[in-house]
Design a protein with these regions (language model features):
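Short, hydrophobic-biased segments on the C-terminal half of alpha helices
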Residues: 58-59, 152-156, 226-233
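Short, amphipathic alpha-helical interaction segments positioned at domain boundaries
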Residues: 88-103, 180-201, 205, 261-272
Length: 347
């Protein structure tokens, strides 16, 4: 299988070139988790994959608790369905705590102090959903002084411990609520089963991909990623490309569009962030700075061919720019991609 075939299958498996999903929460569960550090762009990542969806549809799913937002992998914010949150946290949180241990120390956040703060937060959230600023004030009233930065790590700790997650937006303000309002704590956890489950979810929705890609996306160690891959059933296949082994779930070719399509990709989309090796969709002819590595991609045929920009206050003005202005591309397809983005944001 060559690079073009890999791109074609990835776009199909990630539900970008085609999909049968109609509900935001169905898509999120299929993907396992969707990076959501850029909140507005994360909502567009859902809209990109489900035709005729609007931002109001995604907001409604979030407000109803069908999708929640929390630190989950690597670590950064992700969209996830509540029922998947606890078993994934049980798998990934210990590794994340180790990775950010130096930050805990930097802000003098001992385990005792963080548990005390989270107990105060948990008690406060029983009554009502609260913003970060409101929670920080309550914690301070109880005698635990923090800075804006240190309190961010307390919130992160609370999310990793399965105590809190996103609640219903209060206007443009993010609020927090108890995860237990959506899903009960785990009564049992078998690590090997969770590894297998996450590997199956990843390679089904993002294959063809390598073990290294899986480890990069999940934040798990290479050892754990390999173990998870060993649990893949015989339904999965593998092949070698440039000396690397790729795993995927074979798909009926009738359901894989031959045309990879043209899309305005959101920042930090799963099509890019899911893979450690990005050479398959990065054109070496075009210099892409680290700042641009996950920003505003104009994707043509599964390759990054340019960038796009829009005015948040005036979506009628969307500008696209090709890295190579002389390159022949389907301008109608670009106009359609712009129209899809604008349609998603119509109120």
């Amino acid at each position: 299988m060559d690079n073009q075939e890999i791109r074609t299958l990835r776009l199909a498996n990630q539900q970008i070139s085609s999909t049968d999903f109609t509900q935001p929460e169905e898509l999120v569960q299929y993907l396992g988790a969707m990076q959501a550090q850029e909140y507005a762009m994360a909502k567009w990542a859902i809209g990109l994959r489900i035709p005729n969806l609007t931002v109001q549809d995604v907001d409604a799913a979030i407000d109803a608790g069908k999708i929640i937002r929390m630190h989950l992998l690597r670590p950064t914010w992700h969209f996830i369905v509540p029922e998947d949150s606890r078993w994934i946290l049980a798998l990934t949180a210990p590794q994340i705590h180790k990775k950010i241990k130096s930050f805990y120390s930097k802000f003098d956040l001992t385990p005792k102090k963080m548990h005390q703060a989270c107990s105060i937060i948990e008690e406060a959230l029983v009554e009502k959903e609260l913003t970060r600023k409101e929670l920080a004030a309550i914690v301070a009233e109880k005698g635990i002084q923090t800075t804006s930065q240190s309190f961010s790590f307390i919130i992160l700790f609370g999310e990793l411990e399965g105590i809190l997650c996103s609640g219903k937006m209060r206007g443009n303000q993010a609020v927090y609520t108890l995860l237990s309002k959506f899903v009960a704590p785990l009564t049992s956890f078998i690590r090997e089963e969770a590894l297998a489950k996450l590997a199956i979810r990843y390679f089904t929705s993002r294959g063809p991909a390598t073990v290294q890609d899986f480890a990069y996306w999940s934040g798990l160690s290479i050892k754990d990623a390999r173990l998870g891959t060993q649990f893949l059933s015989n339904d999965f296949s593998s092949f070698l490309n440039d000396g690397k082994e790729y795993w995927y779930l074979p798909t009926n070719n009738a359901y894989v569009p031959n045309d990879c399509g043209t899309f305005l990709f959101p920042d930090f989309d799963e099509y890019g962030i899911s893979y450690k090796n990005r050479d398959i969709f990065l054109n070496k002819e075009y210099p892409i700075s680290p700042f641009m590595e996950h920003k505003h991609w104009l994707m043509v045929g599964g390759m990054i061919e340019g960038t796009w920009q829009s005015d948040k206050s005036d979506l009628s003005e969307v500008r696209t720019e090709l890295f190579n202005p002389k390159k022949r591309v389907n301008q109608h397809a670009i106009h359609k991609a712009v129209a899809n983005y604008q349609q998603f944001h119509l109120k």
